[in-house]
């Protein structure tokens, strides 16, 4: 058997971080088992689903690097209405579905009664049964189609995350599978899609647990082999509440990109939300695929920890090739009015500073003074700069100007003799020198910084 999983987002605005975690686990499960990971766009909400929202999903999947095996044949539910109608007709013909002519008022009265009695909402008055007389069909009413849910027994499955789950069928409604206008409903479309796509493992959020018995009963009615189900726990915000834009939480995956998070780091972090492999915190996706097993997924909700996310991101920045980092940092430098990054070469700058940043935006800031001297803070000036320091910088500039070989080692060799002559410690040279050349007291080793900036530019800045 070839393992087939799917990710089935609804294009109604943005790609949610919880959805990406679901996609990641489905993707990793398929890759671990040498199977297929498929993408389906559940766009039957015609009022909210837009082409722009579809592109947001596709772009988000591309950004995080979750490749799907039906890239040339993504399933769109709106293109499958004929297929859904075909299956509904088959269910009607077999007696596994029926027409219901209840009005909104009748359904509301049933709902209120069911709430009081704790029973299923719909009283099944239009459900055909042996010896039962159905009401007279009202004139001018377009019926919905309901699925004939079994009245006795239980629907149960062994959830790959939550374990044994059993739901009495008497607690389930005869759910609507086609609306009065003929459009199919969510729970029905999902079943037909999973069946036609050959999905063997449905891995999704645990907000779908209540849908599962309904879908299992429909799958049985159409003669399908049941997939296995695994329901993932929610991701909560740092306060332990549901992630929400209204609460100020970052929810869209593209927003994390704007925050300077690498896609590899984002996936690494999301993998650790609800899943563990010993004490391993930092790993590649190749390792994750090798290690991943749904039995290691906790059924309890996970909580966001932005501090941990940034730490993991910093670790990934350290191992990212400088050339790749340069392509990611250049646009951020352009936003900071730095467009020329040849002298010094940005890759060389990144090699020196990338272990000082936990996100790409901070990394871009760390590169600025290599190209343009920054304005020092008042605190740095008060602490490290005075007339004596200014005069000392001019004297040291003469030593720098006399260097024939401009490199880190040659610059470093000037420090001790100069400090001895001036009767000062290195801090009295290094900190003012950083301010004079870079405009900040926080830089890597100053000899390496000067070597990269270049002799002509260093002397110009000191003497400005």
UniProtKB/Swiss-Prot annotation:
Entry's Gene Ontology cellular component terms: cytosol
Superkingdom of the source species: Bacteria
Keyword Protein biosynthesis: yes
Catalytic activity as recorded in UniProt: tRNA(Glu) + L-glutamate + ATP = L-glutamyl-tRNA(Glu) + AMP + diphosphate
Subcellular location, principal: cytoplasm
Motif range ('HIGH' region): 9-19
Enzyme Commission numbers on file: 6.1.1.17
Gene Ontology MF term list: ATP binding; glutamate-tRNA ligase activity; tRNA binding; zinc ion binding
Residues the entry annotates as binding ATP: 245
Short motif 'KMSKS' region, span: 242-246
Single Gene Ontology BP annotation: glutamyl-tRNA aminoacylation
One Pfam family of this chain: tRNA-synt_1c
Subcellular location field: Cytoplasm
Keywords, ordered alphabetically: Aminoacyl-tRNA synthetase, ATP-binding, Cytoplasm, Ligase, Nucleotide-binding, Protein biosynthesis
NCBIfam families: gltX_bact (TIGR00464)
Function: Catalyzes the attachment of glutamate to tRNA(Glu) in a two-step reaction: glutamate is first activated by ATP to form Glu-AMP and then transferred to the acceptor end of tRNA(Glu).
Oligomer status and interactors: Monomer.
Name used for this protein in its record: Glutamate--tRNA ligase
The organism of origin for this protein: Neisseria meningitidis serogroup C (strain 053442)
Gene giving rise to this polypeptide: gltX
């Amino acid at each position: 058997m070839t393992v087939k999983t799917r990710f089935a987002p609804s294009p109604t605005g943005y790609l949610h971080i919880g959805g990406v975690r679901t996609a990641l686990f489905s993707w990793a499960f398929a890759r671990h088992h040498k199977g297929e990971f498929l993408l389906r766009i559940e766009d039957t909400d015609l009022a909210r689903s837009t082409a722009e929202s579809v592109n947001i999903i596709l772009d988000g999947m591309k950004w995080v690097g979750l490749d799907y095996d039906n890239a040339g044949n993504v399933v769109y539910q709106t293109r499958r209405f004929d297929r859904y109608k075909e299956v509904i007709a088959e269910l009607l013909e077999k007696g596994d579905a029926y027409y219901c002519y209840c009005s909104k008022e009748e359904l509301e009265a049933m709902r209120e009664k069911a709430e009081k009695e704790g029973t299923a909402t719909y009283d099944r008055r239009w459900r055909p049964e042996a010896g039962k007389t159905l009401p007279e069909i009202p004139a001018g009413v377009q019926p919905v189609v309901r699925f004939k849910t079994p009245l006795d027994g239980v629907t149960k499955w062994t959830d790959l995350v939550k374990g044994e789950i059993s739901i009495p069928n008497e607690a389930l409604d005869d759910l609507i599978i086609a609306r009065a206008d003929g459009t199919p409903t969510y729970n029905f479309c999902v079943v037909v899609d999973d069946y036609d796509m050959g999905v063997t493992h449905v891995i999704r959020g645990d907000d779908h647990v209540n849908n599962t018995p309904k879908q299992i009963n429909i799958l049985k009615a159409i003669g399908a082999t049941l997939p296995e189900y695994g329901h993932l726990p929610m991701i909560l915000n740092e306060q332990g509440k549901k992630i929400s834009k209204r609460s100020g939480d970052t929810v869209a995956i593209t927003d994390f990109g704007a925050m300077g998070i690498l896609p590899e780091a984002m996936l690494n972090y999301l993998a650790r939300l609800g899943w563990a492999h010993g004490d391993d915190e930092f790993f590649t996706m190749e390792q994750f695929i090798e290690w991943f097993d749904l039995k290691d997924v906790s059924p309890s909700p996970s909580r966001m920890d932005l501090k941990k996310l940034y730490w993991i991101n910093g670790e990934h920045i350290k191992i990212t090739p400088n050339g790749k980092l340069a392509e990611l940092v250049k646009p951020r430098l352009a936003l900071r009015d730095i467009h020329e990054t040849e002298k010094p070469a940005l890759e060389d700058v990144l090699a020196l500073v990338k272990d000082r940043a936990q996100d790409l935006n901070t990394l871009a800031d760390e590169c600025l003074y290599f190209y343009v001297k920054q304005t020092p803070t008042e605190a740095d000036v008060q602490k490290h700069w005075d007339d004596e320091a200014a005069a000392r910088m001019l004297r040291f500039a003469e030593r720098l100007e006399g260097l024939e070989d401009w490199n880190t080692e040659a610059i470093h060799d000037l420090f001790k003799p100069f400090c001895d002559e001036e009767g000062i410690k290195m801090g009295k040279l290094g900190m003012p020198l950083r301010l004079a050349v870079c405009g900040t007291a926080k830089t890597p080793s100053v000899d390496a910084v000067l070597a990269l900036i270049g002799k002509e530019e260093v002397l110009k800045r000191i003497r400005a």
